[in-house]
Swiss-Prot record:
One GO biological process term: trehalose biosynthetic process
Cited function: Catalyzes the production of trehalose from glucose-6-phosphate and UDP-alpha-D-glucose in a 2 step process.
Span of the signal peptide: none
Family: In the N-terminal section; belongs to the glycosyltransferase 20 family. In the C-terminal section; belongs to the gob-1 trehalose phosphatase family.
Species of provenance: Caenorhabditis briggsae
Entry keywords, A to Z: Glycosyltransferase, Transferase
SUPFAM superfamilies in the record: HAD-like (SSF56784), UDP-Glycosyltransferase/glycogen phosphorylase (SSF53756)
UniProt protein name: Alpha,alpha-trehalose-phosphate synthase [UDP-forming] 1
InterPro entries cross-referenced by the UniProt entry: Glyco_trans_20 (IPR001830), HAD-like_sf (IPR036412), HAD_sf (IPR023214), T6PP_C (IPR049063), T6PP_helical (IPR041064)
Catalyzed reactions per annotation: D-glucose 6-phosphate + UDP-alpha-D-glucose = alpha,alpha-trehalose 6-phosphate + UDP + H(+)
Enzyme Commission designation: 2.4.1.15
Root EC class: transferase
Compositionally biased intervals (Acidic residues): 96-109, 1356-1368
């Protein structure tokens, strides 16, 4: 094969040398060829590096040539051209740095071989094999292990050799390309050829694609930047579908390897995600809808100009996205502080089965009827509550064949094209063709269009039903094959019904690829239809990969994905999954079927919440995760009965949600007089042929091997053998609705069961009652009213599945007929629920007849007898008891609990705060929630309900009592009446400090939570655009009252407005923008404050910086700040260390690297010291432990003097020892002590001066070079430590400085005034508290109509200076 390809390669090179002139895309300038040319090379006489090789777009797939053979031929040409020809049996090429390769983790072991477990020289004969795609039996095949290993067919040998060539080609081309030297462009072409092969057959070439990705390693981003433009060019030029194939290939790789390599593609080509997911189209739609809402509100208040009343001028509206459109006569005096969207949360329901049944009438028109399945009954009430909800499912109308002519489905911004050249995917067609003579194919399209019309009509009167269209072959394999051939029996723990075709690893892999592809199509449809605030609800075992694929595709539909901030808030995308069937896989599921098992279990952990029918199923899943999935953290909250599993940076909540029925619907039908009459007729018709005292046993289910019908009939047969006196009396009415007859295992099972029923009827007769039959067996379904009539007619309901998720039939029976008895097997989820509720216990009584093992025919028969002979009084008592329980726990409770936003790990749950560590952990979680709130508000995204619940639960927590029980109280009520003092235990260790407590004044923490809750209410109201209303909201907490607050705010705002637009803005934090907290770790910036500061920085200033004495990290400003990056620079340690973003950080260079390294080692030892129980208290008091630039601070006492002197003395001794051990001569470190803390300094060569905030301003001026002599400068502070900052700004900006001070200290005010007077600065104002300053900033922001032109006009940098050069970018914080 290789020799033939090399010969054709040489022939191809000779032909190429005489190529005609080409344009930039490699196409003949005179005539467009029918197929694009192959790879083009320069002649041998042409210098190698004089002209770069032109990268052509991907070739159009050739129908007359095998894709693999074609790719290998072209790849061999490339290898020849880069002087690395392929030699069979010998590896040749360039060496490769192993450091560049990204290898797979150790937990992905090689899959077991097909012949594993077969002894040598033995023959395995497969007597029956089912083709899982068609459900048909195929001829038996004989596997001989010796022959298989010793000889290989010619075709498989060629495949192995082809794979070797491709792997070697990838390795060689990558090695040449990554060096960026001679032939690198040609080597890139070789890699592109391999990629093209993978994209032409993504499901079949996943192994090659994996090799390509793993070889590229950390150079993937660079590779995508080079080749994705060719992918796009190919799609646009030749109508290929490579972008879609690339997206699927990446998802398939991520699913199989538990990776997230798709983010590398997004990082390389930011517009790729927006284009493929239609994000720009969604953003346009959301913005337009939001503008319409704003217009409607403005019209209601009679402020809207009629010329904007029409929807025609969309472009004009979009340009006014941030403004309220009003009449010119009533021009706005303010603009919204933020621009929010108030679209309510929708439920995006995703299921394989549709909620409707679609059929075609004889006239050719389509008819849609409401479905009747269990899923529909469960979910339809939730979906019908809002017409904007969306249900995505497959309607059974799929693509029957591969389209020969491709056409693009979206334009460059992701909008669907109005006209589609090929309408095979009928639901992508949005416009009907003009009337003309139609071909048969076009007539089929017209017919499909009529279906689309019916769907549109359906959607007008109900929720939105959107079809997911897939390739029919893929669907058959996914549904009729792996879903029902493997997953269904496996999860029911019925391995005997698993198709033997899955013993072949290659067959399993092929069907697994189809399963992934269909899941991918459902996922991408859900992502394209979802908004940030929606809840996506995935159902059942068909779609278990959707959570992982959606997270790979979208990253997050919430805050972090918009800015591509990887690694933050991964769990913000709300995706729930509910498994309607059991989760009881066989013991070898994770080993024998590892290709399927591990990816499914890992994928389930990517959902936000996963619901199981029973605690038994959840426990099985948790154990499976613990045993087989590495690097997981499993927690259990007994109060909420919730497991939380963390894996790969994601967290998943696992709950038990027993599904139920809509009680009212069944009760109303059961009470209908017509139903009662029909029930009497049924009973008379059946039991009229029996002896007195006979009992009617009734059972109804799908004709499925999981329902235990065969075991039931065997037990029924044994029942009459064991209790012959019941012959002629009792009747079993069995309804088994036939389904899946196309699947061999189902057809065989159904035939065997019907034969058994016939055998029982032939075996047992009653001479006295000759018309009596022991079994009435029907295979047709019953309408609901007639089904309920049978429930009323029965004496005993029989529900005995081998395994079932819940089985709602048992609930339907006793809801409709509470006087009936119930025979229930432990395999039913309903039995687990009733058993957990104590309905089968010695204390509460045994309210039903439990079948422990349906395979135990003797015990099963005894259960029948016990039910038949049970007294009516006992039966009525037990039935009524269960009936009351079921009526309370109905379908509404099930959906409400699953959709409850409070039930998730993302919500701060009500917790017990007893110790210092618990209190600080709680405050840290509020910081995370507040950051999410701020990002949502600043981006105009809806506020999720769980934000409010989290803050409420943080404020209302459980305070432990002295007794064992705990009571639910709030933090403020935990404090003594009239105070905000909170007393907590210092630690839980025994010893001399046992019982030692510490008291905090948490007034600021409580007050800021109250303000944030008020802010959340305001921002979600219709008044959110009114900044003055927001200021009133803050003013309601002001100690002087809202009127005085408003007046003080306006006075401060007037001064701020005089200086707008500020060129520079420097401010202190604690005491200026944030009230002082009980300790620094709890001084979390409130959400409302962060929003005000961010919007002020965005609209009213150019360069903004917060200068603080706190450090950056290690209990520093970055840990308590909630403003997103990019709004403010942070000058920590009085401006000695600066942080703009992760790539821009710098610090004062007064310290040598050796001295700083010494201090870092000292800090690490002190951290270890404070982890010891004896000294742990010092982490939580005051400023805790902080690592500044140049010194370390360790708190030793709180303001109340709570810490015992002996404890402080021991800490001092340990600190002195650590310092002396590292610096025994005292030449580098020095230790100081104040009333509240210890400080360890590095002795710097500063000529005796103390570094202050003025030096920090000077440092940032030197490094970033802002031009402070032009434009206004705003300075805010509250203490003596801020005066050097003001003085430095006055030196640089003089009278253009505007300053606001938060102080009532007359002496401090006098110092500030005198300092400003010295520099002729008269722009001074004093306020009483940080909230007034924040209110003034909000007022000034809303009343200053700035735009981007103002910002561009600012003279931020000196004419001769530029921002920091790339090569001068400071290194990251050490």
């Amino acid at each position: 094969m290789v020799q033939q390809l090399q010969k054709s390669m040489s022939d191809g090179m000779a032909t190429t040398a005489a190529a005609v002139p080409m344009n930039a895309n490699g196409v003949d300038t005179g005539k467009v060829p029918t197929a694009p040319p192959d790879v083009f090379f320069s002649t041998e006489n042409e210098p190698e590096d004089c002209t770069p090789v032109k990268m052509d777009p991907f070739d159009r797939p050739k129908s007359d040539k095998d894709p693999v053979e074609d790719a290998i031929e072209r790849l061999l040409k490339v290898m020849e051209k880069i002087d690395c020809p392929y030699t069979p049996g010998k590896e040749k090429g360039v060496d490769q740095d192993e450091s560049d390769d990204m290898t797979e983790s150790e937990d992905h072991d090689e899959m077991a071989k097909d012949d594993e477990g077969i002894p040598a020289n033995e023959v395995r004969v497969e007597t029956r094999k089912m083709d899982c795609t068609t459900g048909q039996l195929v001829a038996p095949r004989i596997y001989e292990k010796v022959d298989t290993l010793s000889s290989t067919s010619e075709s498989s040998a060629e495949e192995d050799e082809s794979m070797m060539i491709i792997k070697e080609g990838i390795r060689v081309c990558y090695g040449v390309w990554k060096k960026r030297q001679k032939n690198s462009e040609m080597a890139l072409k070789g890699l592109a050829i391999v990629l093209e092969l993978c994209l032409t057959q993504p499901s079949a070439r996943d192994e090659i694609f994996s090799v390509l990705l793993e070889t590229l390693g950390f150079n993937t981003v660079t590779y995508w930047k080079a080749v994705v433009p060719q992918v796009v060019d190919s799609d646009l030029t030749y109508a290929t579908q490579y972008r879609e194939a690339l997206l699927f290939s990446m998802c398939l790789y991520d699913v199989n390897h538990s990776k997230n390599r798709l983010r590398e593609l997004y990082a390389a080509i930011p517009g790729f995600r927006q284009s493929m997911l239609g994000i720009r189209a969604k953003q346009f739609t959301e913005r337009y809808r939001h503008l319409q809402m704003k217009i409607a509100r403005s019209r209601q208040s009679s402020r809207m100009s009629s010329k904007y009343g029409s929807e025609d001028n969309i472009q004009a509206m979009v340009t006014l996205a941030n403004d309220v459109i009003m009449d010119e006569e009533t021009a706005p005096t303010q603009m919204p502080l933020v621009d929010m969207s108030h679209d309510k949360q929708r439920v995006i329901n995703v299921s394989n089965a549709p909620p409707v049944s679609i059929s075609r009438k004889t006239s050719g028109s389509w008819e849609i009827k409401q479905g009747s399945g269990g899923l529909v009954a469960c979910v339809d009430p939730v979906m019908s509550a809002d017409k904007k909800n969306i249900w995505l499912s497959n309607l059974g109308v799929n693509m029957q064949e591969e389209l020969k002519e491709h056409s693009t489905t979206t334009n460059s911004i992701g909008l669907p094209l109005i006209k589609q050249a090929c309408a095979g995917e009928v639901f992508c067609v949005l416009e009907r063709n003009e009337k003309k003579e139609l071909t048969p194919k076009q007539q089929a399209v017209e017919s499909d269009m009529s279906l689309l019309s019916v769907l549109n009509t359906y959607n007008k009167h109900s929720y939105q039903l959107n079809p997911v269209v897939v390739n029919q072959d893929d669907y058959d394999t996914y549904y009729g094959g792996i879903s029902n051939g493997l997953l269904w029996p496996a999860l029911h723990n019925l391995p005997q019904f698993i198709s033997p075709c899955y013993n072949d690893p290659e067959a399993l892999r092929e069907q697994w690829c189809a399963y992934v592809r269909v899941n991918y199509l459902f996922s991408i449809n859900a992502a394209r239809n979802s908004r940030a605030q929606d809840f996506i609800w995935i159902h059942d075992y068909h779609l278990m990969l959707c959570g992982q694929i959606m997270r790979s595709l979208e990253g997050s539909l919430d805050v972090s994905s918009i800015e591509e901030r990887e690694g933050k808030q991964k769990e913000s995308l709300q995706i729930g999954f509910f498994l309607h069937i059991p989760f009881q896989p066989p013991a070898n599921f994770m080993t024998k079927y590892r290709t399927v098992g591990e990816p499914i279990v890992r994928a389930l952990l990517r959902f936000t919440k996963v619901g199981f029918q029973t605690s038994r199923d959840r426990e099985t899943f948790v154990k499976l995760v613990a045993d087989h999935i590495k690097r997981t953290k499993i927690d259990y909250d007994s109060r909420l009965d919730r497991y939380t599993i963390e894996h790969d940076g994601f967290a998943c909540s696992l709950g038990v949600f027993p599904v139920s029925i809509k009680i009212a619907d069944f009760v109303n039908i059961a009470k209908n007089p017509q139903t009662v009459i029909e029930a009497e007729e049924i009973r008379k018709q059946i039991m009229g042929k029996c002896a007195d005292g006979g009992q009617l046993f009734f059972s109804v289910e799908r004709f499925d091997y999981t329902k235990g019908i065969a075991e039931k009939l065997r037990a029924w047969q044994r029942y009459f053998e064991k209790y012959p006196d019941r012959i002629g009396k009792d009747v079993l009415f069995q309804v088994a609705v036939t389904n899946r007859r196309s699947v061999e295992s189902y057809r065989q099972y159904q035939d065997d069961v019907m034969a058994l029923a016939e055998l029982i009827n032939q075996k047992f007769h009653s001479e006295q009652y000759p018309e009596w039959k022991p079994v009435i067996f029907e295979t047709d379904g019953l309408p609901r009213s007639r089904l309920i009539a049978h429930y009323l007619a029965m004496d005993i309901g029989v529900v005995t599945p081998s395994k079932d998720g819940m089985n709602l039939v048992a609930k339907e029976m006793l809801v409709c007929n509470p006087t009936a008895s119930l025979v229930l097997s432990t395999g039913a989820g309903t039995e687990v629920q009733l058993s957990n509720a104590q309905f089968y216990s010695e204390q509460e009584g045994k309210c039903y007849h439990r079948v422990e093992d349906i395979a135990n025919t003797e015990a099963f028969a005894d259960n029948f007898f016990a039910a038949a002979t049970e007294s009516k009084e006992t039966r009525n008592k037990h039935g009524e008891k269960i009936n009351q329980f079921l009526c309370v726990h109905d379908i509404d409770e099930w959906s409400d609990q699953f959709l409850d936003p409070k039930w998730t790990h993302e919500v701060i749950s009500e917790c017990e705060v007893k110790q210092l560590g618990q209190f600080y952990g709680l405050m840290n979680r509020t910081a995370q929630v507040r950051r999410q709130i701020v990002e949502c508000v600043l981006k105009g995204l809806p506020i999720r309900p769980h934000f409010k619940f989290s803050l409420e639960n943080a404020k209302v927590t459980r305070q432990a009592n002295d007794s064992e029980c705990t009571t639910l109280t709030s933090l403020e009520t935990s404090c003594p009446e009239g105070t905000s003092k909170l007393t907590l235990e210092a630690d839980e260790e025994s010893g001399e400090e046992k019982g030692f407590k510490i008291t905090y004044d948490i007034h600021d923490e409580l007050s800021e939570m109250e303000k944030d809750l008020a802010f959340l209410s305001f921002i979600q109201s219709d008044e959110y655009e009114n900044a003055e209303e927001f200021i009133k909201t803050i003013g309601s907490f002001y100690e002087g009252g809202p009127i005085l607050f408003s007046e003080e705010v306006k006075q401060a705002a007037e001064m701020l407005q005089r200086g707008i637009h500020y060129n520079t803005f420097f401010t202190d934090r604690d005491g200026t923008l944030k009230s002082y907290a009980c300790s620094y770790p709890t001084s979390v910036q409130p959400a409302y404050s962060a929003v005000i500061q961010a919007q002020f920085a965005r609209r009213c200033a150019t360069f903004c910086a917060i200068v603080t004495t706190a450090p950056l990290i290690h209990t520093g400003i970055l840990e308590v700040a909630t403003i997103p990056e990019g709004y403010y620079a942070y000058g920590a340690s009085a401006g000695r260390e600066w942080y703009l973003n992760p790539a821009q950080q710098f610090k004062d260079r007064s310290f040598s690297a050796v001295d700083l390294t010494l201090m870092n080692k000292v800090f690490e030892l002190i951290e270890e010291l404070l982890e010891k129980p004896e000294f742990r208290t010092f982490k939580w008091i005051g400023s805790g432990i902080q690592k500044h630039c140049g010194h370390i601070t360790i708190a030793k006492q709180d303001v109340n003097g709570t810490i015992p002197a002996r404890k402080v003395t021991r800490l001092h001794e340990q600190l002195v020892k650590i310092v002396n051990d590292f610096d025994p001569t005292g030449t580098t470190l020095t230790m100081r002590e104040s009333d509240l803390d210890f400080k360890i300094y590095v002795k710097a060569k500063l000529k005796g001066r103390i570094f202050n905030k003025g030096h920090g301003i000077r440092l940032v001026k030197e490094r970033l070079k802002p031009n402070m002599s032009k434009g206004s400068c705003l300075v805010c502070g509250d203490s003596e430590s801020d005066i050097p900052m003001l003085e430095e700004c006055l030196k640089l900006a003089g009278s253009k400085v505007y300053t606001i001070w938060v102080t009532r200290d007359q002496a401090l005010q006098e110092k500030v005034s005198q300092l400003c007077e010295r520099y002729s600065c008269t722009n001074i104002h004093y306020v009483t508290c940080p909230q007034v300053l924040l209110g003034a900033m909000a007022y000034a922001t809303a009343h200053t109509l700035t735009n981007e032109k103002n910002r561009k006009a600012d003279s931020y940098y000196d004419d001769s200076d530029t921002p920091m050069d790339q090569e001068d970018t400071p290194s990251k914080q050490q």
